[in-house]
């Protein structure tokens, strides 16, 4: 029999995060190590852990820091990386991924974290949590290391949907600005629309239409629109939020992660080249550690699914314990700030503005009625 949560941790002041222990490349042991790292750093976080209960209990028992802070949900099935989203939607009720989202849907947890199949996670999230009213396509927002004071820029969509028309890109701008405002304490985020150049005549027709829409809503939605931006601006200082479609965004983030790993590898090779370079590495060890930390993809592991009735964090399938801990920290931070509720209010107000503008004026209505 599965243990029941202690009032979802609210009595002790904890914020409960629902975690899918399965689906990651390294198995549940790494997930448990990751939540243990989070628990050690943050006494206010508790967990509902989903997967084969007997296996998970043995792993958790080895981590004293998790004593009394984990509730188990026994799930016999696992969503694999090869499973098609449509199959998971039809047959995935007994999977750890489904159960993880169900805890958020039922109000037992403030957010969900999973390393599993991205397509399946998005499909199940839309099925179980539903989209916010007014949202056509949810988006995945990620944090990209940047030269800005906050250290990161928000990029969305990072792969939820390869399609995005002008209205979708407007919604991404609104949701991305809200994420930056609540997650990074930026009162008036700067938003840029990714294009092949900054000149207004460049880009596809839908990008030009999106540019006009995002500029039109900037004042009412309390963000600054800087216009078109290029790929070089993603880690730059020109804007805080970069808006694009899921195909382009996913390519950008994967390229950035690969580049960061390559730089780290090249630096290690360079400092091993000669005795003098080894000495130089010892003298610069503090600066090198700071640089390594800034560009480490694990520190920003976790894409946020925006546009849903609940907070869902998608962790990399290859995440280690540091990456899992970063994803949990993100879920906790957003839950603590009341981000889901604020985003829902922002999207609802934007939808109302759109409806108001689309509604006919009195003269137009009379003209339509006379037809």
From Swiss-Prot:
Gene Ontology biological process terms in this record: fatty acid biosynthetic process; phospholipid biosynthetic process
Q: Which residues cross the membrane?
A: none
Broad EC category: transferase
Q: What is this protein called?
A: Phosphate acyltransferase
- Which Gene3D superfamilies does the record cross-reference, listed alphabetically? Isopropylmalate Dehydrogenase (3.40.718.10)
- Pfam families attached here? FA_synthesis
Q: Which PANTHER family match?
A: FATTY ACID/PHOSPHOLIPID SYNTHESIS PROTEIN PLSX, PHOSPHATE ACYLTRANSFERASE
Whose protein is this, by species? Ruegeria pomeroyi (strain ATCC 700808 / DSM 15171 / DSS-3)
Task: Say if the entry is tagged with keyword Secreted.
Answer: no
């Amino acid at each position: 029999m599965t243990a029941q949560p202690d009032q979802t941790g609210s009595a002790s002041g904890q914020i409960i995060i629902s975690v899918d222990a399965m689906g990651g490349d390294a198995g549940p042991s790494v997930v448990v190590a990751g939540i243990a790292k989070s628990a050690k750093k943050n006494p206010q976080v508790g967990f509902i852990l989903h997967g084969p209960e007997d296996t998970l209990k043995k792993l958790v028992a080895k981590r004293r820091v998790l004593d009394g802070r984990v509730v188990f949900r026994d799930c016999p099935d696992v969503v694999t990386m090869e499973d098609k989203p449509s199959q998971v939607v039809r047959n995935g009720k007994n999977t750890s991924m489904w159960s993880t989202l169900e805890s958020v849907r039922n109000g037992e947890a403030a957010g969900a974290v999973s390393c599993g199949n991205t397509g399946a996670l998005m499909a199940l999230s839309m099925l179980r949590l539903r989209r916010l009213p007014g949202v056509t396509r949810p988006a995945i927002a990620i944090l990209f290391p940047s030269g800005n004071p906050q250290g990161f820029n928000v990029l969305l969509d990072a792969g939820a949907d390869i399609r995005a028309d002008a209205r979708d890109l407007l919604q991404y701008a609104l949701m991305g600005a809200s994420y930056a405002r609540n997650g990074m304490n930026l009162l008036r985020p700067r938003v840029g629309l990714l294009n092949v150049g900054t000149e207004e005549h460049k880009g596809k027709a839908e990008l030009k239409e999106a540019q006009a829409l995002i500029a039109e809503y900037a004042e009412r939605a309390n963000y600054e629109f800087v216009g078109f931006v290029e790929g070089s601006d993603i880690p730059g200082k020109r804007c805080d939020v970069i808006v694009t479609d899921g195909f382009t965004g996913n390519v950008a983030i994967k390229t950035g992660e690969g580049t960061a790993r390559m730089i780290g590898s090249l630096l290690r090779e360079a400092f091993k080249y000669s005795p003098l370079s080894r000495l130089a590495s010892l003298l610069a060890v503090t600066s090198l550690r700071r640089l390594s930390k800034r560009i480490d993809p694990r520190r920003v592991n976790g894409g946020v699914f925006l546009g849903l009735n609940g907070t869902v964090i998608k962790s990399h399938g290859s995440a280690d314990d540091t990456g899992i801990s970063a994803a949990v920290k993100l879920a906790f931070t957003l839950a603590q700030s009341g981000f889901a509720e604020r985003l829902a209010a922002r999207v609802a107000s934007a939808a109302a503005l759109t409806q108001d503008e689309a509604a006919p004026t009195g003269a137009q209505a009379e003209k339509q009625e006379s037809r």
